A protein has these predicted regions:
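A non-catalytic structural micro-motif
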Residues: 195-197
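Generic N-terminal amphipathic, Lys/Arg-enriched alpha-helix
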Residues: 1-13
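A polyanion-binding, active-site-adjacent surface
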Residues: 3, 15-160, 168-170, 175, ...
Length: 220
């Protein structure tokens, strides 16, 4: 199957595109877009990959589901389009950045600038029905995104994987801690942020690790 995705990712993920589960997933997604309002817009389903080529990835942040409100999701986990009110988790992410490294919250919740520096902002499920959180879970996306994470973890070394909350931590359980830095904490959601997300210093710890391995730090 010919999938429109950035070329270096295509080289690593083509075996997935040729599997039966991905064909079934594609049929499901096409059907959903034809009948319902689905986020993100179809052209942005693989935005995380297109903005952050395989060879440029330095950091991976794993999310769960795209935002399901109008105008929010654009294919990057935790990120929203310019001009959209910051969701609560993103507010808390910016609070932790301020406390950790002193950088003030930006005027936009659009994290494209992180992606362009080598931060793969990957949701486990890449599509969702409007106003129905989790509606596209267990349809095959998780298998595909597992394959993407595995390709990175096996082909590269000295990456930073940031896993907030139990869902992301389970998804990243197979990552070799001897080859990569794996940072875990509570999720930035208001329900859990005070249980270990605040004060995790993941942003400075990421940059310290990158610097120690000869990589440019991320401008958070």
């Amino acid at each position: 199957m010919n999938v429109q995705i950035e070329e270096s990712w295509k080289a690593h993920l083509q075996p997935e595109f040729d599997k039966d589960y991905f064909r079934t997933l594609t049929e499901f997604v096409i059907s959903e877009y034809s009948q319902y309002q689905i986020f993100p817009p179809g052209r942005l389903i693989f935005n995380a990959f297109n903005l952050c080529p395989f060879d440029k990835v330095k950091v991976v942040i794993i999310g769960q589901d795209p935002y399901h409100g109008p105008g929010q999701a654009h294919g990057l986990c935790f990120s929203v389009n310019d001009g959209v009110q910051f969701p609560p988790s993103l507010v808390n992410i910016f609070k932790e950045i301020k406390a950790d490294i002193g950088t003030d919250a930006p005027t936009t919740g659009n994290l494209t600038r992180w992606a362009e520096q080598g931060v793969l902002l990957l949701n486990a499920t890449l599509t969702v029905r409007a106003h129905q959180a989790g509606s596209h879970q267990n349809r095959g996306w998780e298998t595909f995104t597992d394959a993407a994470i595995r390709a990175l973890a096996e082909s590269k070394e000295h990456l930073v994987f940031i896993l907030w909350g139990s869902y992301a931590q389970k998804k990243g359980a197979f990552i070799d801690r001897n080859k990569h830095l794996v940072l875990t904490s509570a999720h930035p959601s208001p329900l859990s942020a005070y249980n270990g997300f605040f004060g995790n210093k993941h942003f400075s710890r990421t940059n310290d690790y990158l610097k120690a391995h000869g990589e440019t730090e991320i401008n958070w």
